[in-house]
Amino acid sequence: MSQRNTINYWLVVDTIRIPDAISVITNKMKVEQAIVLFAGSDFDYLQDKSPLLLNIGSHSEVLEKWLTLPNFDSSSVIFELDSRHDGFEFTEYLQSLLQVKIDNKACFLRFYTNAFWNQTASQLNDIDIATLLGPAQAIHWVDTAHHRQTLHYPPQVSEPSQAFNLTSPIFKLWV
């Protein structure tokens, strides 16, 4: 009999838009682990402006609680990550995702905002979805109608290489 792996929910929140994010979250839910996303990355010098990466546990009700947090609908996303994956490993992956190539041009990617996902999700090819999700199984964000949206890792797509080249046509409009 196969055992089902536990999912951990990882919240990435833009602390420029929500400076008191950690206190707002800890008042509503338990934080298992908190990581400053820019710490140890090429953007280490911007730690005071860094998004936070928070493991908010393995219970799916955190998705509903998240929807009730003020301003989090526009300034955060939640990744679903198999508990076999280490938080620091995931952090390194997300740090790499901050700098991508679009049409051979280096770009800073704010993948941790709903605006990014609202603009791109329906137009992403499977390879870009796999690149953007990396080891995560899914991502959740809030659309403009305040409904939670979810994008799952595409079936039958292998793990992307570490060359973060985004090729969906939507990105060509950005460069």
Residue ranges and their predicted role:
Residues 1-108, 112-175:
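Non-transmembrane, aqueous-exposed alpha-helical and coiled segments at domain scale
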